[in-house]
């Protein structure tokens, strides 16, 4: 991508993303920092919604089954692509790896995100506590959660109380999955920013996911599911911040060692905090997560610690792009 970036006019950069997930936050932040903005919608109905916002300059409808054409059009527009969960789900990790447009972050990490076993191996490489992973139902000796590969927002995940229930449920599955130990405690999702400009890992915020049939009004009548419908704000105990930052740094080092590229931009570690205050990480996202939407427009509680002013993640991305462009470091941000 470095050759494409060299051809870009740095005075006319555009920021683009798929019209979903965190697009409003990303594009609002980009416009605030003076960039042209492009939203790429799945269909015309979605496009109409995004066209109402003043900070979005152009709204396209794109063919996600053949994203290469859209990527080439983005390059012609001097655009930088910001990936998020809907991009991974709609376009697919294989197309995302090959899309010929500068893309924020460690693009190769998308391949690892698509495989739940590789994800857990990477967390283990980082020296971060993880839940037990069962390769076979015969190993199970307690409650477990079954999760599918890919960015699905929790859709289809289910809990089994033991081996017999698990074996019965697995017979109906037709896609790849992982069986993990079910953890008891408080869910907490940590937002980080890896900055090539400032040479640091920032703890930027945290959230709790609000999940249908787990957190909703079911009164015990509905089977638990884990479809994410929104996110709740979370301010962590200050005594937890050093270990959370340490895990973020260790993860970044493991990515560089095992995946072969440096983290750049936002990422997330997803965890359970147990009653002894220990943290077990069961998932990661190598790009911006929807939980950052909780402080859109008024800034994360930790952004003031780094910049002495409130900043949301969309603004943080735009800030890094602006400073990287000035310093000639865009090729450290985009792959």
Swiss-Prot record:
Task: List ligand-binding residues for 5-amino-1-(5-phospho-beta-D-ribosyl)imidazole-4-carboxamide.
Answer: 21, 86, 231
Q: Where is the ATP-grasp domain?
A: 107-315
A Pfam family assignment? DUF1297
Tell me which residues bind Mg(2+). Answer: 270, 283
Which pathway does it serve?
Answer: Purine metabolism; IMP biosynthesis via de novo pathway; 5-formamido-1-(5-phospho-D-ribosyl)imidazole-4-carboxamide from 5-amino-1-(5-phospho-D-ribosyl)imidazole-4-carboxamide (formate route): step 1/1
Detail which positions bind ATP.
137-189, 211
Q: What cofactor does this protein call for?
A: Mg(2+); Mn(2+)
User: Could you give the cofactor binding note from the entry?
Assistant: Binds 1 Mg(2+) or Mn(2+) ion per subunit.
Family label: Belongs to the phosphohexose mutase family.
**Function comment:** Catalyzes the ATP- and formate-dependent formylation of 5-aminoimidazole-4-carboxamide-1-beta-d-ribofuranosyl 5'-monophosphate (AICAR) to 5-formaminoimidazole-4-carboxamide-1-beta-d-ribofuranosyl 5'-monophosphate (FAICAR) in the absence of folates.
What name does this protein carry?
5-formaminoimidazole-4-carboxamide-1-(beta)-D-ribofuranosyl 5'-monophosphate synthetase
Question: Can you name the source organism?
Answer: Pyrobaculum arsenaticum (strain DSM 13514 / JCM 11321 / PZ6)
Tell me what gene encodes this. Answer: purP
């Amino acid at each position: 991508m470095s050759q494409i970036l060299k051809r870009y006019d740095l005075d006319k950069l555009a920021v683009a993303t798929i019209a979903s997930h965190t697009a409003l936050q990303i594009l609002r932040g980009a416009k605030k920092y003076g960039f042209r903005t492009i939203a790429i919608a799945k269909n015309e109905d979605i496009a109409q919604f995004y066209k109402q916002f003043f900070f979005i300059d152009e709204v396209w409808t794109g063919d996600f089954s053949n994203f290469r054409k859209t990527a080439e059009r983005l390059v012609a527009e001097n655009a930088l692509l910001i990936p998020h969960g809907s991009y991974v789900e709609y376009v697919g990790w294989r197309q995302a790896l090959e899309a010929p447009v500068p893309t924020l972050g460690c693009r190769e990490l998308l391949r690892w995100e698509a495989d739940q076993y590789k994800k857990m191996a990477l967390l283990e490489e980082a020296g971060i506590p993880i839940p037990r992973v069962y390769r076979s139902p015969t190993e199970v000796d307690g409650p477990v959660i079954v999760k599918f590969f890919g960015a699905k927002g929790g859709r289809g995940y289910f809990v089994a109380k033991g081996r017999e229930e698990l074996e019965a449920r697995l017979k109906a599955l037709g896609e790849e999955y992982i069986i993990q130990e079910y953890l008891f405690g408080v869910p907490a999702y940590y937002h980080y920013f890896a900055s090539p400009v400032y040479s640091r890992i920032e703890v930027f915020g945290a959230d709790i996911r609000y999940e249908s049939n787990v957190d909703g009004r079911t009164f015990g009548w509905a089977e638990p599911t884990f479809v994410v419908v929104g996110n709740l704000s979370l301010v962590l105990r200050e005594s937890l911040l050093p270990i959370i930052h340490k895990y973020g740094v260790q993860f970044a080092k493991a990515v560089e060692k095992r995946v072969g590229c440096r983290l750049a931009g936002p990422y997330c570690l997803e965890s359970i905090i147990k009653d002894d205050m220990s943290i077990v990480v069961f998932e990661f996202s190598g790009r911006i997560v929807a939980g950052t939407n909780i402080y859109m427009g008024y800034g994360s509680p930790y952004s003031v610690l780094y910049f002495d002013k409130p900043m949301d993640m969309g603004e943080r991305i735009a800030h890094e792009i602006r400073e990287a462009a000035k310093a000639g470091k865009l090729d450290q941000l985009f792959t």
